[in-house]
UniProtKB/Swiss-Prot annotation:
Binding site for ATP: L93, G94, T95, G96, S97, F98, G99, R100, V101, K116
Activity regulation comment: Activated by cAMP.
Domain Protein kinase: 87-341
Gene Ontology CC annotations of this record: cAMP-dependent protein kinase complex; chromatin; cytoplasm; cytosol; nucleus
Domain of life from the UniProt record: Eukaryota
Biased composition (Basic and acidic residues): 13-33, 42-56
Top EC group: transferase
InterPro entries cross-referenced by the UniProt entry: AGC-kinase_C, Kinase-like_dom_sf, Prot_kinase_dom, Protein_kinase_ATP_BS, Ser/Thr_kinase_AS
Domain AGC-kinase C-terminal, residue spans: 342-397
Reaction catalysed by this enzyme: L-seryl-[protein] + ATP = O-phospho-L-seryl-[protein] + ADP + H(+); L-threonyl-[protein] + ATP = O-phospho-L-threonyl-[protein] + ADP + H(+)
Keywords in alphabetical order: Acetylation, ATP-binding, cAMP, Cell cycle, Cell division, Cytoplasm, Kinase, Nucleotide-binding, Nucleus, Serine/threonine-protein kinase, Transferase
Family recorded in the similarity comment: Belongs to the protein kinase superfamily. AGC Ser/Thr protein kinase family. cAMP subfamily.
Protein name: cAMP-dependent protein kinase type 1
Length: 397
């Protein structure tokens, strides 16, 4: 669904079931959790609305000032390129607690984009200012075939606007739910593309921190695009912040220990497990029990998992950081060289010169919304001028 790609190619199906549902917005079926500076203890919602407190933890990321200067020097300027008048708002693609995502069309080049709109007052009230600014920064730095592209940002007195690629094929999550589970070659294909995206992010000292099927979109050809960088962060050494989606959170995060890129490889293992099994290994309807299982439960496999994938997952979903693949001396190479990935030609995959296992049934080319749910449209009040009490908090937008 990249705004730079041309439509084409025949339609393929996976188990004769087709992916649909909403363009990725700010929230999804499995809610994320986060702490931020000034909000160090986290209330974790339980079934029935009860809450339990997670332990307080420091909000610290270790790096020196010179390192950070070199990192942000890579960033593209995102503000000043566009304004609301440059686009026609067509329909809502997704909604969330911070705002909504719209399908828009440029009045200049006719291309379709996704516009993520966040309400400043809500972002501030929910203490997500740092994560919102980090999302803009990370997306202004990354450029990769399997990662969403942000084209620019702007703001008014009440909202923040982020202009992104529009990805027509929908969420991997939707396809997985319709398919119940993926055959081994299909899961391997998506996992390999995710692996390359993680390798790229980690090469820039960015940890993603919220890997799950809901945050993976499929373009018109069936290749992935990782989206939603709200929890991504520059971490050259270690950090402490509790964030992520409970089923996917690594044990070192749950136990409030310092962590680094290792947490993405744990989540990568959970992703592979869910794609193959149709469920996550430590799921419980009670979030606190999920955390307990992550810390203590034995990793069990369905009988149809083959030996190679069981070996890979046992090396990814391990609490021993000295044994977790991706976190060892050879980094991502240890993951890519595992026998489960032996058929993957990584160079061809990176160049997208490989047939995908599923091609979304897009009929009308760019701007097609057939893979997304419909949302009730609301009267919008964008472009508000006047006093902005939060101007200093979002100055880079």
């Amino acid at each position: 669904m990249s705004t730079e790609e041309q439509n084409g190619g025949g339609q393929k199906s996976l188990d004769d079931r087709q992916g649909e549902e909403s363009q990725k917005g700010e929230t999804s079926e499995r809610e994320t959790t986060a702490t931020e500076s000034g909000n160090e203890s986290k209330s974790v919602e339980k079934e029935g609305g009860e809450t339990q407190e997670k332990p307080k933890q420091p909000h610290v990321t270790y790096y020196n000032e010179e390192q950070y200067k070199q990192f942000i020097a890579q960033a593209r300027v995102t503000s000043g390129k566009y304004s609301l008048q440059d686009f026609q708002i067509l329909r809502t693609l997704g909604t969330g607690s911070f705002g909504r995502v719209h399908l828009i069309r440029s009045r200049h080049n006719g291309r379709y984009y996704a516009m993520k709109v966040l309400k400043k007052e809500i972002v501030v009230r929910l203490k997500q200012v740092e994560h919102t600014n980090d999302e803009r920064l990370m997306l202004s730095i990354v450029t990769h075939p399997f990662i969403i592209r942000m084209w620019g940002t702007f703001q008014d007195a009440q909202q923040i606007f982020m202009i992104m690629d529009y990805i027509e094929g929908g969420e991997l999550f939707s396809l997985l739910r319709k398919s119940q589970r993926f055959p081994n070659p299909v899961a391997k294909f998506y996992a390999a593309e995710v692996c390359l995206a993680l390798e790229y992010l980690h090469s820039k000292d960015i940890i993603y921190r919220d890997l799950k099927p809901e945050n993976i979109l499929l373009d018109k050809n069936g290749h992935i695009k990782i989206t939603d960088f709200g929890f991504a962060k520059y971490v050259p050494d270690v950090t402490y912040t509790l964030c992520g989606t409970p089923d996917y959170i690594a044990p070192e995060v749950v136990s409030t220990k310092p962590y680094n890129k290792s947490i993405d490889w744990w989540s990568f293992g959970i992703l592979i497990y869910e794609m193959l099994a149709g469920y996550t290994p430590f799921y419980d309807s009670n979030t606190m029990k999920t955390y307990e299982k992550i810390l203590n439960a034995e990793l069990r496999f369905p009988p149809f998992f083959n030996e190679d994938v069981k070996d890979l997952l046992s090396r990814l979903i391990t609490r021993d950081l000295s044994q977790r693949l991706g976190n060892l001396q050879n980094g991502t190479e240890d993951v890519k060289n595992h026998p489960w990935f032996k058929e993957v030609v990584w160079e061809k995959l990176l160049s997208r010169n490989i047939e995908t296992p599923y091609e979304p049934p897009i009929q009308q080319g760019q701007g097609d919304t057939s893979q997304f749910d419909k949302y009730p449209e609301e009267d919008i009040n964008y472009g508000v001028q006047g006093e902005d009490p939060y101007a200093d908090l979002f100055r880079d937008f």
